Amino acid sequence: MQSDNEDNNLEAFFGMIDSIEDDISEMLEDENSELSGYECLVISFNCLTLFCRQVEIDFGQIEDHYSESEKSRSYENFKGFDSVSNLHEYNEVGVFSMALEEIENTLTAFEERCKKTGEVFDEWNCVFIMYACLRKYCDQAKVNYGEIIGDVLNLQSSLGKHEKTESDDMNN
């Protein structure tokens, strides 16, 4: 049985996915905004790292676990993006939207499996599944993961500085 805190964390996790989809939709509606698959990945990894911080999941541990499972190939083969074998047939944002849909489908399948097997369906496993699917998307789209995380950290740093400046201005 899951605690209320775990249920709230799962609710927040799925809310995060919805907010990613909403952010991408809003940017697509803005005529002045140019959006590519790369920006979609930055948005997603930014939200994922912020969620991890919020629920006290060590994002580095997720990265390490992924690296280890990638070496041993012992992880479950996430449906991921095998169905999106030719990424160039679609526009990048369309492909990324399909990737988010696949993440949701993978999470639903994992939740169903957990109900049958008694495995734990918690925020850590959800974060890992989403992370693994996003990394698989990076690999198939030939996007440098290190650059994405660098951009995420720069974004978070500049937002943190901006928030601090606003806070200082309000206190003066």
How would you describe each model-predicted region?
Residues 28-39, 63, 114-122, 142:
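Charged, low-complexity interaction regions
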Residues 164-172:
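Short acidic DE-rich linear segments
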Residues 5-8, 39, 50, 56-58, ...:
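Asparagine/serine/threonine-enriched low-complexity, disordered tracts
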Residues 58-95, 110:
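Long, low-complexity or tandemly repetitive, helically biased scaffold regions used
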Residues 5, 45, 51-54, 59, ...:
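Intrinsically disordered, low-complexity repeat/linker tracts enriched for polar/charged residues
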Residues 3-31, 39-49:
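Short terminal alpha-helical segments
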Residues 9-22, 92-106:
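Short amphipathic alpha-helical heptad-repeat segments
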Residues 40-51, 96-99, 123-137, 141:
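An amphipathic alpha-helical micro-motif enriched in hydrophobic residues
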